């Protein structure tokens, strides 16, 4: 089978490591019948980059802050958000990258920097699709116009995330323009505390909890329990 752009490849990596006959050629993957039994594999599950993105997002918008995140997955198909943070002006260093069962894992150091706007295109979207709500919040504090296109998949997540992002950022005072497949945000802008409409979406709730760290006044969520879907301890 094939895919238009490179997407998450955890399944392919795991199958290869247990002895499956799997081959990859650019964006095409083929699996041949293998009469051999697959080999057992010990796996230490690394820290999830989509969850870590919220803490990294806090560093991005809070001056003079820094953070070390331990044992985080750095697989390039999942690391687009962190690559974008570096492009926006943050200092980001991999401290001890290694391979765990075929997956790249590292401690990372992140330090706040002066934020500048970036553009995200369709080819980049798969590597940061779940982190776009947090990236949108960060973009409100960046100098210039951040543009995200090719993210139509956000329309069919736990909520229509394009609508959810735009609704809440506009309420907070951000300058944001909607596209069918994304949006643009012009910054930096001062955010105001409001009641956040989460649309029952855990990533919207967590992204705007981080936004509240730099918003004036009080920010409340209309539904906090939805974060239990992915991060009950958040």
Where would I find each of the regions flagged by the language model?
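Short, structured segments at the rim of ligand-binding sites
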Residues: 1-234
